[in-house]
Amino acid sequence: MKDYDLDLIQVLWVEDDPMVIEQYPLKAENFGLQLVAFPCWDEAKAALENDFDRWSAIILDAKCKYHRDSEDNAVRFLGRALNDIALICEKRGRVIPWYVLTGGDAEEVSDSINDDRMKWDADWTNSTHKEYYSKNVDNEMLYKRIKVHARKSPRLQIQKMYKDVFDAIEECGIDDMGYNALEDLLIPIHFPDAIE
């Protein structure tokens, strides 16, 4: 049984600033997003691997930590986290869009971000000439963009098309394997191009 709000788009969020963790999720809910914060990449990676189908997007604070006790280093953190995300998504056969949200040094952050994100976020870079979102001015725009990108996800579209069925699965207490199996059956029927 899912232990989170199915009406909100689930966003895995790597952020270690307590003030940001307290404030940002409230605003994100207004956009239909639930930000689930993890203080370091180790913990976020475990959540991504253990509940992959839950997540519709990933937000990375560029100045976050790879390990709970490591020092902030955007180059090391982003390089390793983005590599891990690519490997996990490839293994699972589904791309989860990721975004970098930072209040840090633009040059250091930009140099650390690979071009994978251009598959879903190229129009942002083309219009702003940035590969990241600024905590100071872009967070609401990021939430809007995540919502738009997530709505295009075949998995979320199936959940909306068959909302009554998935609600019944929840009410009956059927475990996540049944829920995921039904999604896996319905996606190729409605979105054959989404299958690789």
What are these regions (language model features)?
Residues 24-28, 110-118:
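Short, aromatic/basic amphipathic alpha-helical patches
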Residues 43, 108, 123-150:
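C-terminal output helix
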Residues 35-36, 132:
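Generic structural signal for residues in well-ordered beta-strands
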Residues 37-57, 65-66:
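Acidic, metal-coordinating helix/loop segments flanking the phosphotransfer/catalytic sites
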Residues 2-19, 24-28:
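Conserved acidic segment of CheY-like receiver
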Residues 54-98, 103-111:
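Conserved phosphotransfer microenvironments
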Residues 12, 97-99, 122, 133:
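Hydrophobic/aromatic beta-strand patches that form the interior of the parallel beta-sheet core
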Residues 134-137, 148-195:
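Charged alpha-helical initiation segments
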